[in-house]
């Protein structure tokens, strides 16, 4: 990774701020900020916005109430195709606003209904069940994935590396791509690590 930025200390952030996908997404036109559902993270977007603007990243917009959206529900499949998880943390109004903000450069929006799972507090996002590692490679937990979405991924030529139940419970499906086929994964999940390495990925844990 050629450049890493650290968010400065700010009283609007907390321990959960390490999950930097959640309060915003950066697009080619600027950042979109999301109001976090967890009260303790409600002002996190403000700290992120202030810092990103200070380093020259413009603001495209923000999802406003009653819209709800979190970055963990937004997965880019390519530059013009985005999948959005519709669940406890992202609602229809939030999706509508995101469509409006990105309509000039996104051609296809795929809304993916999310299961209730273990309940709202479990915070199940779309990125809990799919992590893109390259344009044609993803780590997935198919058990929580709608059939139409899984079929769509396969039709796009994306190879799916399946996480089993045991490693899913250890966050094995949460993989961060640093570059195509270069990723950061949680240690203690040897099977999905081996699957990634079998596809030529460099895996850091």
Describe each model-derived feature in a short phrase.
Residues 1-205:
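The feature marks the mature, well-folded catalytic cores of soluble enzymes
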């Amino acid at each position: 990774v050629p450049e890493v930025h650290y968010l400065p200390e700010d009283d609007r952030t907390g321990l959960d701020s390490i999950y930097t996908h959640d309060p915003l997404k950066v697009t080619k036109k600027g950042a979109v900020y999301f109001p976090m559902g967890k009260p303790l993270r409600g002002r996190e977007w403000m700290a992120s916005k202030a810092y990103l603007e200070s380093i020259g990243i413009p603001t495209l917009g923000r999802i406003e109430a009653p819209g709800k959206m979190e970055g963990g529900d937004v997965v880019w499949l390519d530059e013009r195709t985005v999948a959005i998880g519709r669940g406890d943390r992202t609602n229809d109004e939030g999706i509508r606003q995101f469509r409006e903000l990105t309509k000039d450069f996104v051609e296809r929006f795929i809304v993916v209904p999310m299961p209730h799972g273990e309940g709202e507090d479990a915070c199940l996002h779309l990125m809990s069940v799919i992590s893109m590692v390259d344009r044609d490679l993803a780590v997935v937990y198919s058990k929580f994935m709608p059939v139409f979405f899984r079929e769509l991924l396969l039709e796009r030529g994306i190879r799916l590396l399946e996480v089993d139940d045991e490693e899913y419970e250890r966050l094995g499906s949460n993989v961060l791509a640093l570059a195509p086929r270069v990723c950061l994964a949680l240690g203690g999940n040897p099977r999905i690590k081996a699957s990634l390495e079998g596809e030529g990925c460099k895996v850091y844990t």
